[in-house]
Design a protein with these regions (language model features):
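Surface-exposed cleft-lining segments at the edges of enzyme active sites
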Residues: 84-85, 110-126, 162-167
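Short, acidic/polar
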Residues: 12-25
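Active-site-proximal beta-strand elements of phosphoester/diester hydrolases
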Residues: 1-9, 101-113, 146
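Metal-dependent phosphoesterases centered on the DNase I-like endonuclease/exonuclease/phosphatase
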Residues: 51-54, 127-170
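Structured beta-strand-rich core segments of catalytic domains in phosphoester-bond hydrolases
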Residues: 37-39, 44-112
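Active-site beta-strand/loop signature of hydrolases that rely on acidic residues for catalysis
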Residues: 7, 23-41, 104, 133-155
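Soluble or luminal CAZymes and related metallo-dependent hydrolases
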Residues: 14-15, 89, 121-128, 170
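Short catalytic/ligand-binding loop motif for oxyanion handling, primarily in non-cytosolic enzymes
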Residues: 40-42, 64-65, 113-116, 152-161
Length: 170
């Protein structure tokens, strides 16, 4: 199974730049998208239901912000939105689909760069997400986690490492 993950930084913008041509030519089994920045009621039918894929969405409540999606050729057994924690779920950061043998996540982790309060939110999100994963693993589930973690392990992980040295997540 070929699984692609992409922070699109605005789904409508990448659609205008040929996203569906790319999707058709590459033909991945699954595409996990982060930072879609669109609510489903604002999307055209061809985006909501891409040809050859089952599409699942977890947009943020706030228009033009955050949000994740998964397009999959194989229909999942179940779909789960969020972590079950409203202060995280309202930002549309987690989408999980269950297949018979594993669960697949598309996650857009908070970046925590806009002050101490948001950094605390980011760390609490990490804790809640890891607790959620441990609970699923305790139930015997295999997990595949994709997404934008907003944490860089090494300088090569950033476009501008020198400019980001003092930012959270690096």
């Amino acid at each position: 199974m070929r699984i692609f993950s992409w922070n699109v930084n605005g789904l409508r913008a990448v659609v205008k730049k040929g996203f569906f041509d790319w999707l058709e030519s590459e033909g991945p089994d699954v595409v996990c998208l982060q930072e879609i920045k669109a609510r489903t009621e604002d999307l055209d039918e061809n985006i909501l239901n891409p040809k050859g894929y089952h599409a699942f969405w977890n947009p943020a409540e706030r228009k033009g912000y955050s949000g994740v999606a998964i397009f999959t050729k194989k229909k999942p057994v179940a779909v789960h939105l969020g972590l079950g924690i409203e202060r995280f779920d309202c930002e549309g950061r987690v989408l999980r689909i269950e297949f018979k043998d594993f669960d697949l996540f598309s996650v857009y982790f908070p970046n925590g760069t806009s002050g101490e309060e948001r950094l605390q939110y980011k760390m609490e999100f990490y804790d809640a997400f890891l607790d959620h994963c441990e609970e699923l693993r305790g139930q015997g589930r295999e997990l595949v986690i994709t997404g934008d973690v907003n944490t860089a392990h090494k300088p090569i992980d950033l476009k501008n490492p020198k400019a980001n040295q003092k930012n959270s997540g690096f």
